[in-house]
Structure formats: C-alpha cells, structure tokens
Amino acid sequence: MRTALLFILLLLTACNQGPTLERLGGPTMGSSYSIQYVREPGGPEPAQVQRAVETILHDIDHHYSTYRGDSIVSQFNRLPAGQCLALPPDMLALVSLGQHLAEQSDGAFDLTVEPLLDLWGFGPQARHQQVPEPQALAQVRQRVGYQHLRVKGRALCKDAPVQLDFNSIVAGHAVDLIAARLQAMGISSFVAEATGELKAVGRKPDGSPWRIALELPREDRQIARQIIPVDSLSVSTSGDYRHYFEQNGRRYSHTFVARLGRPVEHDLAAVTVLDASALLADGYSTLLLILGPQQGWDFAVAHDLAAVLVTRAEGGFVSRATPAFERAVKGQ
C-alpha cells in the first residue's frame, strides 16, 4: 500500500512539473555556441541535445574550417587551377548563395577572399598584420574572383588558383541546421546561437518572448543599444570593431571589398539583419557592411531587408533602421 501510494505521489508530482528552461554551450569555430530551450515534461535532456548540436558543429568544422588541413574546403583550396572537387550538397548550396551575393554586390562580397585575408594578416596562413606592398597585393588579387568558380555536376571547379573562405555565411548555416534539429527533437521554443549568429523560436516558459540585445559597436565593452523581441527570426550582426589593426594612424578591419583587394574604408561600424533564415541574415549583414553606409542602405531598402545600419559619428553612433526592420520588430 505504501509503495502504491508513493508511486501515485511521484506520478502526480511529475504531472505537475511544468516546462523548464535549459541551457548548454561550448566552443566552436574559434568562438562559442549556446543553446537555451524550453524543455517540456518528458522532453529531451540537455546531454542529448548537446550531443545532437555538437554532431552538427563537428560536421561544419570538417567541411568549412580553413584552419584544418583535412577539411573539405582546405582540400579544394590546395587544388591548382583547372581542377575540380566533388562537394557535399550543403557546400554546393553555400557556394551558390555566395555566387548570388557576389553578383548582387558587383563582386564586393566574394567567397574567394581567403588569399587577401592571409596577405593582410587575418587568415589562417597569415604571418603578421600589416599593409602589404603593392606588388604583393597585385599578385594576390590574381587569385581572387568569384568569376573563376563554376559548378560542374556535383563538383566545384576553378580556372584560377582561388581559395574559398565561408566565414561570412557558415555560422548562419550552422544555426539553421541546429534549429531544424531541435525542432525535429520536439523542441518548439529555443534560442540557438553560434559565434554570435542566432535564431529564436517560440517563447520562454512564462510565455514572454525571447528578447535579444543589439550591441553598440564598441571594442572595449558590451553595451546594448536596443533590445528587441524575436520569434521565428534569425539575428545576425556584422561589424568591423573587434578584428582590426592600425598602421600609421589608419584603421584596417577584417572586412574586405574583394574586388578592390582592400579592407573597407567607410564609417559604417555594424549592420544587423533579421530574417527567417540565419544563413541569409548572416550573408546579407556582411554584404551590407562591405557596401558601406549609403550604398548598403540603398541596397537594403531596394531588397526589402530588415536591417539596422550603425554609423560612426562625431561623439558616438547613429542608427538607421529600414522599414522592413521596423515591421519585423513589431511582428508584422
């Protein structure tokens, strides 16, 4: 009788347990990832979720890391001109998006920027950060250009010794994959974040929306400039304020105008883009940052992108939000 009564009490206690907020995270892509999710009674445990997430991130690293000699992208980058390499479908899809963004930006955005990153001191083969000599820059620019890539069946081919760098879009791709996996596991409310790119779906256990802080573009500390409610949207911010060097009083960031072979030279400090796809948000935030304050604004408005552009001004920053961003924040 006591055993039966104890079983009934335990069962009633389990039935009364509501949803809980679980958190987990770890290192990835030279940075970190974090997951918050609402665990319903009987839902997947954090350890199970973490294994699923890290399986995805391991595959991402094997496909896209330029810091691994055995990655697929490193294998492609070592190929001489005139050669092809069979790629997994997801890599071909990202190449296709990169080519589309390159065409939209007249070559300002370009996945073949890797040799420039190395030359200026931001890539995996970099020796030191400095402005390169004109002759060295001219030689490297011959190895940059999206027009040197072509897809042949399931293979990617090159007609010049170009090298790929997916860092402008791969974190968003990872977030989309993680979000899809969480939903397949029956998790309907979560925030999935990798290297700062994130996607929020559903609501917290108390029914309130997920709220995301958009930072001021400062390298010394983190200060929120705006906090927005997010549901079923991805948030991507690209900026030039954390990875840069200075030489002779000038600032050189890791964001490049590929067709010019140089870092950006304008006052646009950061761009945030909202989109249902973390991949697209990631790509377009980078593209707008490359284009600069006015050309980026014109592009965002013309393509109905939900974007905020933060420009350096005397004494601080000026933020400018597109109509699509205002609608997205209001849930329209």
Regions found by a protein language model. Name each.
Residues 1-2, 16:
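N-terminal hydrophobic targeting signals that begin at the initiator methionine
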Residues 4-13:
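Bacterial N-terminal signal peptides
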Residues 14-332:
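Mature catalytic core of soluble alpha/beta enzymes
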